[in-house]
């Protein structure tokens, strides 16, 4: 599995997401009991509590599947070992459209990574910008298409392994 096919997480983020998954799984019997209690109230066609409990169960199960998929494809605590190449787990600085006054520094990772200090923006390697930068070397210019259809060019200024 290559670095672009995995989700890079710090140990702290992995532990936080695993705890959330464990809590959701442990909560399954509570939701099932709630559904059963509401079912016993009578006519299901007009039972708002029953439908709300079923909707909550659906949302919870979707989040469980999302977390299981995320954690099964996670590479924990392993920032890229090399500098100068944009990879998941790299802190990168870019110039937009060749304008040195229009720069941004961010982490290429998932939103779930959620850098705790709040000082560093996070772009997914699956986002247009993150995907365009994967495997770029310092000095290289890449282009990507934004949702409105226009093309933006970015030049990689630096790429360093993330350290929390």
Swiss-Prot record:
GO BP annotations, alphabetical order: DNA-templated transcription elongation; regulation of DNA-templated transcription elongation; response to antibiotic
Modified residues (N-acetylthreonine): 2
Cross-referenced PROSITE patterns: GREAB_1, GREAB_2
GO MF annotations in UniProt: DNA binding; RNA polymerase binding
Protein name as it appears in the record: Transcription elongation factor GreA
Family the entry assigns: Belongs to the GreA/GreB family.
GO cellular component, one term: plasma membrane
Keyword field: Acetylation, Coiled coil, DNA-binding, Transcription, Transcription regulation
Pfam families: GreA_GreB, GreA_GreB_N
Coiled-coil stretches noted in the UniProt entry, renumbered to this chain: 50-76
InterPro entries: GreA/GreB_C_sf, TF_GreA/GreB_CS, Tscrpt_elong_fac_GreA, Tscrpt_elong_fac_GreA/B, Tscrpt_elong_fac_GreA/B_C, Tscrpt_elong_fac_GreA/B_fam, Tscrpt_elong_fac_GreA/B_N, Tscrpt_elong_fac_GreA/B_N_sf
Function noted in UniProt: Necessary for efficient RNA polymerase transcription elongation past template-encoded arresting sites. The arresting sites in DNA have the property of trapping a certain fraction of elongating RNA polymerases that pass through, resulting in locked ternary complexes. Cleavage of the nascent transcript by cleavage factors such as GreA or GreB allows the resumption of elongation from the new 3'terminus. GreA releases sequences of 2 to 3 nucleotides.
HAMAP family: GreA_GreB
Organism listed in the record: Mycobacterium tuberculosis (strain ATCC 25618 / H37Rv)
SUPFAM superfamilies, alphabetized: FKBP-like, GreA transcript cleavage protein, N-terminal domain
């Amino acid at each position: 599995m290559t670095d672009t096919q995995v989700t890079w997480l710090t140990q702290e983020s992995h532990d936080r997401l695993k705890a959330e998954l464990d809590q959701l799984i442990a909560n399954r019997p509570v939701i099932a009991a709630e559904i059963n209690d509401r079912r016993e109230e009578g006519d299901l066609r007009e039972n708002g509590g029953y439908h709300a409990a079923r909707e909550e169960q659906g949302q919870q199960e979707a989040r469980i599947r999302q977390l299981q998929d995320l954690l099964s494809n996670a590479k924990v605590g392993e920032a890229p070992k090399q500098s100068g190449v944009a990879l998941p787990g790299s802190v990168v600085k870019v110039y937009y459209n060749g304008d040195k006054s229009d720069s941004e520094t961010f982490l290429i990772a998932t939103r779930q990574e959620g850098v705790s200090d709040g000082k560093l923006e996070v772009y997914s390697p699956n986002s247009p910008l993150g995907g365009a930068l994967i495997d770029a070397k310092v000095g290289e210019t890449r282009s990507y298409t934004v949702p409105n259809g226009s093309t933006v060019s970015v030049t990689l200024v630096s790429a360093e392994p993330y350290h929390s």
